Amino acid sequence: MQVWPGEAYPLGATYDGAGTNFAVFTEAADRVELCLLHDDGSETAVELRESDAFVRHAYLPGVMPGQRYGFRVHGPYDPGRGLRCNSAKLLLDPYAKAVSGSIRWGEEVYGYHFDDPERRNDLDSAPHTMASVVVNPYFDWGDDRPPRTEYHHTVLYEAHVKGLTMRHPGLPEELRGTYAGLAHPAVIEHLRELGVTALELMPVHQFVNDHRLVDMGLNNYWGYNTIGFFAPHNAYASWGDRGQQVLEFKSAVRALHEAGIEVILDVVYNHTAEGNHLGPTLSFKGIDNLSYYRLTDDPQYYMDTTGTGNSLLMRSPHVLQMIMDSLRYWVTEMHVDGFRFDLAATLARQFHEVDRLSSFFDLVQQDPVVSQVKLIAEPWDVGEGGYQVGNFPPLWTEWNGKYRDTVRDLWRGEQRTLAEFASRLTGSSDLYQDDGRRPLASINFVTCHDGFTLHDLVSYNDKHNEANGEDNRDGESHNRSWNCGAEGDTDDESVLELRQRQMRNFIATLMLSQGVPMISHGDEFARTQQGNNNAYCQDNELSWVQWPDEEGGAGEGGEAAEGAEGVDTGLRDFTRALVWLRREHPVLRRRRFFHGRPVEGTHDDLSDIAWFTPEGREMTQQDWDSAQASALTVFLNGNAISEPGTRGERVTDDSFLLMFNASAEPIDFVVPVDHGRQWQVVVDTAKPETMQEGSGKKVEAGDRLTLVDRSMTVLQRPA
């Protein structure tokens, strides 16, 4: 076999049409072997003799796409000094563009002996671990272009590749649970009809099913356990894992883009799947443990601000390079449109504390590729000072956990919530305005993958996570949920009716709030997880979206999950209507914060926003401070939008009155005078059916409208 010197850049395996260049960074190694793996179980070892700036490299003519490979790193094994080299372990390339196979868990994939953790384990891991794969970078993108949907037009839909597609009756069996399933016209049609503009995918980077979960008969369904930051997860491919997963993912992105839907990836750059000092040796740990991980003062142990056993070393230039290379790769080569960063506060930890000016954010800010896509932070981690909502730099948007908590509190009847609710409804200026950000920095959500589904939020007071095998100890215990009078399944019609109303309240509030709304997949069908608020390990019907069939009943695959109340197509229709109402009216998705006064240049004497008690008088400070107050009316002035259109034109819109009754009693609302003479009801969450355009009741200033307990009504006045 010919071995040429090759190049130190780019890192990873790079196929050029005639052969492949291999390059891997390691400061810890004495010697590195590239192992080409053959289908008969044998391997050909090639020593990487060339080294530039601690990058070992070689070029191998004739090595083609589909070739499986790994590295064996020879060097010191001294955990007490943070060194864990072990040439018996076949290691994944940190820059692998595809990964083949899965782990067969056993002592072979660990760097130590189970019965003697201080002793190096020299069992060969190759037959038991995954392999890196050389991929062909060439793909016919045609005329693919990123949709580049502006934030004020964006409606996010958080989804799991398998969970969204596994039970869809319109998908061929072989496409369910796959990237190709995402690209199927039946799935795309649902997203388009719902009004979704961006699909936020839960992790699709190559991840690992934990040893502990596999032993329990479970697996890491959510996927927040990355081992390959450049490789699409191979189990989501419908037709092979020797690079086919890359082509299938690209094809899915191309199809979604053709439909005008952006693809945003949930990425986990805060830790890896190698766990703590008792975790397996799969890649980074054996290549250069000191360079990749944050270690404690006793370097045999790992610092953990993620709750997973380890944290990547964010002050290491090689970790930062890997993350930035990964982000650029997914944008330039895979054509994704943005990222949601899991536990993003960890990315700001150069040292112990969270630093919003850390090197990572500097690198993102100046990067001509990454800085131009959507950047969404999950603005917290489990370390000290990790809750950082409102503290990310101006380029970033954030999952607004305070929005979620406040909206939940309002509709479950918590006292003293109106003032904060007003802030959340109008874009959370208290969090974002001072540093020059706009309402669009707030990603508003009521539910997401982590926690109760929308159905379960109104059906359970307590978590029911027994199926996870941890005696219901896992998952959040403070859910701000309310079961409407009965825990879980019930035949009580009044409870069921109230639950339906509450779900409509949450959807309507979300879609009528300033900021960027995010729907959790299946909530439009009232998907239930039977009270499990931490279904990270439930790769089964509990987590998969149940779709209606053509007749509107339960989807193929049987009845609804045990105890479920069926597929709610009425809620889907309501959700569609609210999404499209939002999309059609710029006053519901302003790019600037409200002023609370008349806007200069609009020739309108009315404020751009006004707040009223149910009696129709403007709110006073005493009203805001009232512990019992749980109802109000909001006036949104469509004639007082301060921001111009894309060509500098003045934007005008219809005006709206949003009436909220979060109390346990019916309340008579007076339509405010002096803010418009004639109005029409366009949304009423007390009614199970979705209103047809123009069919709502007409009312005039001074009229009374009775809102039943825990309901919401929206009035519209033409511009």
Language-model segments: residues:
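Conserved alpha/beta catalytic core and glycan-binding cleft of carbohydrate-active enzymes
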Residues: 356-521, 526, 534-538, 554-558, ...
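Substrate-binding/active-site clefts of carbohydrate-active enzymes
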Residues: 125, 160-336, 343-366, 386, ...
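Carbohydrate-interacting/catalytic domains
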Residues: 1-153, 157, 162, 179, ...
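Conserved, mostly hydrophobic/aromatic
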Residues: 24, 71, 159, 201, ...
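Short catalytic/ligand-binding loop motif for oxyanion handling, primarily in non-cytosolic enzymes
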Residues: 78-82, 165-167, 207-211, 271-274, ...
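Hydrophobic faces of well-ordered beta-strands that scaffold small-molecule active sites
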Residues: 155-157, 199, 263-265, 339, ...
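Core domains of carbohydrate- and sulfate-ester-processing enzymes
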Residues: 75-140, 211-225, 279-303, 418, ...
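Short, flexible loop/turn elements at secondary-structure junctions
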Residues: 26-28, 50-52, 62-64, 75, ...
